[in-house]
Structure formats: C-alpha cells, structure tokens
Amino acid sequence: FSDLTKFIVSEDENVQNSFNSLVKAADKTIESVEVNGSDIAFISYTSGTTGTPKGAIHHHAWGYAHIRTTAKSWLGVRSEDIVWATAAPGWQKWIWSPFLAALGSGATAFVYKGKFEATTYLRLIEKHAINVLCCTPTEYRMMIKCDAFGTFEYPHLRSAVSAGEPLNREVI
C-alpha cells in the first residue's frame, strides 16, 4: 500500500485536512448523469426474519414513488422533523426510512452508531427531540420493559412505526 495516497480528515480546524476546509475547497460543480426510472438505484438486503437475507434490487422509479407515498402516508415525515430509523445501512429498512423518507422529504436523519441499549435509546429520543421513530418490534419491546421508560419525556415524538417482524398488541 505504499503507493496509495493517505490523508486524515478531521473536524479539528487546526489539522491540514479539516473536513470544513476540504468542503470549502471542493469543486462546486456537479456533473449530473442521466438515469431512467428503470435503472438500478439501490441494492439492499432484507432482514432475514423468515430465512436467509436476500438482495433486493430497486429502481429509480421505486425510490421516487417511495418518497412520494411512504414518507408522508406511513411515517408521517415533515420537512422540519428529526427522523430516527435504527436500521443499519445496507439493510432494506435503512433505505426506506432515514435515506429516502427523511432526506427525500427535507427532514433530518438522526444517526447513532452505538449498540442497542434501551436506556440509551430512550435518552437519545428525548435529548434529540426525535419526531419520527422506526425501530424493530424487539427494540420497542425492550424499551418498554426498561425500568427507565417512564423517566423520560417524549413530547416531540409524533410517529413510531416498526418493520422487520410482527409487533405484538401489548407493545402498541
């Protein structure tokens, strides 16, 4: 790897390659590429709940239709919202919610890289004023069973949806 160019990007303005200085120096011209509705836009993977995860190919027309229908009608995303879908990139659910629905609606997609821990999730929902939450039913069950559930307040949370497995009536 000795012939590779290596550099470090940092938020620290005092280093040679700070993120902000690289963005400011970058070419502002974007060369667009013509695509058709039938061209492949995404390849993501199903959760594997009912078997081995499967690659799912989606076309540009699907992504557009998703933004136009699901963001508004299923998640209830508004442009001023903070949306947290806990699925990891690469999984089908991540494409649906934080990527297409949130960003395609002009909302903010909240990202948390840590492991699931019920109290941490509840604290983040409160602290970051999450408006739209999409978790797996297992995550919801664990949060509701958490002793700290009632100690947090969720006045901003307007929509909570799930995907990936059945959601039992007790959680709802």
Can you annotate each of these PLM segments?
Residues 1-37:
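ANL superfamily adenylate-forming
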Residues 38-39, 78-82, 155-156:
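Short acidic capping loops at alpha-helix termini that bridge into adjacent secondary structure
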Residues 40, 46-49, 83, 125, ...:
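Conserved S/T- and glycine-rich ATP-binding loop of Class I adenylate-forming
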Residues 49, 106, 164:
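Conserved G/P- and acidic residue-centered "switch" motifs that form tight phosphate/ATP-binding loops
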Residues 64-85, 89-132, 145-146:
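Conserved AMP-binding/adenylation subdomain of ANL enzymes
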